[in-house]
Amino acid sequence: MGNHKAALTKQVFTFASELYAYGVREVVISPGSRSTPLALAFEAHPNIKTWIHPDERSAAFFAVGLIKGSERPVAILCTSGTAAANYTPAIAESQISRIPLIVLTSDRPHELRSVGAPQAINQVNMFNNYVSYEFDMPIADDSKETIDAIYYQMQIASQYLYGPHKGPIHFNLPFRDPLTPDLNATELLTSEMKILPHYQKSIDASALRHILNKKKGLIIVGDMQHQEVDQILTYSTIYDLPILADPLSHLRKFDHPNVICTYDLLFRSGLDLNVDFVIRVGKPVISKKLNQWLKKTDAFQILVQNNDKIDVFPIAPDISYEISANDFFRSLMEDTTVNRVSWLEKWQCLEKKGRKEIKCYLEQATDESAFVGELIKKTSEKDALFISNSMPIRDVDNLLLNKNIDVYANRGANGIDGIVSTALGMAVHKRITLLIGDLSFYHDMNGLLMSKLNNIQMNIVLLNNDGGGIFSYLPQKESATDYFERLFGTPTGLDFEYTAKLYQFDFKRFNSVSEFKNATLLSETSTIYELITNREDNFKQHQILYQKLSEMIHDTL
């Protein structure tokens, strides 16, 4: 028994120390019996912050938010059995978004697998469709090889925590009873750092010269790290190229004349220009209309993404580069004789007129977009916005026009689950206001517990149209009218004031845009600001804006 305890202690203390060595500073633990050894090891480590969350699904998304906010890998830990399965949505989001989430699932020892033992399911390779690396660790014993396996596996897995290969990894860790390590053996807990991998690349620009010397070019930038924007702006300025900037690109925070923000509304309203080449940077953009245009254009398409698994959506490019945006555009700098002034001015003219139409529209509108426009106005430069999927991110795409705020969202799998938890995780490291719809909010109300338990301050702006507003824009509304409200509208009739009381949030309800205009978003307390809207009215008012922009484009071109 003594040998078992010593071996278990050495294994879990070494594992915790190795995670620290590769940059982990936070671990989110969902309580359970089988995870006792590692939970105690993390709690005992002097330089690792532990968070406790009883809901594994929300806990995993909270960790995703911590990673987004800290830009470091974060680990999650749960007990054996179905607890682990609840991690799946957040792991899928992390895989598509290249988020270094370290998944630690505790397991029964090998002799208790597949024999009907309680709280035992097959956890080996259970996330193999969504993780970049996975390993079933050996059980603790007295051998040197068991400890060596930790060093070997962490070194292999570290390539997925940084650089172009980033993504979630999974370690399954079986433990035998008794489960308590020796908490007095703290000399085994170390805080030494490893040399982290560094990636640097350049390209031979000569292969692109004949393409880039053409006149009508566009730079389209999707979700990417804010450190990557400098050279995009420099290149655009030197070579007079318009930048169509997604709200998650971190480019709309710059008041730069080449940054085009209204493109989704312009394409939605009938814009169709001939283009010679497109440089696509980062993740795919949110705008459905821009993605549809990319699928049909004859323009030569160059894709630049700083990861090893290229996301080619909406269409495979003519050429792609695995390289950072800064390195790519730095490699392209050279003298050129191409005069693109008239091409750039055409886009700048459309942008200016588009903004004017949006401003006029918002002065009269009473729909959800008017609420969103007011929220953007009220958000200070010290704060960031976390935007839920479905309609909120689309309204922000259309209405965020060069304001110095950062915008974040879960745009990997684009699901509505885990939004509250992800935003709260980010709120640990940044001042965050969450914009979310009522169905997405309902889906992750459990996540609010972390604010209550840990005094995490975050304001929530809740657009409540009592259902799924985005479906009003889809063909189902016209083709399935008899069944639409029950199958797609999905009204719940929930009173979220009780949710606020349950989790100790302040609560304010607004029935009109004029009421919300006079409100102040407080930074000292956590408040839910519920904005009551109407789905049908929201749809009709959006159509008015599209028509106005269509007329403007027709008159301009």
Swiss-Prot record:
Reactions the enzyme catalyzes: isochorismate + 2-oxoglutarate + H(+) = 5-enolpyruvoyl-6-hydroxy-2-succinyl-cyclohex-3-ene-1-carboxylate + CO2
Cofactor(s) the protein needs: Mg(2+); Mn(2+); thiamine diphosphate
Highest taxon of the lineage: Bacteria
A Pfam family hit: TPP_enzyme_N
The keyword RNA-binding is assigned to this record: no
Family per similarity comment: Belongs to the TPP enzyme family. MenD subfamily.
UniProt protein name: 2-succinyl-5-enolpyruvyl-6-hydroxy-3-cyclohexene-1-carboxylate synthase
Biological source species: Staphylococcus aureus (strain NCTC 8325 / PS 47)
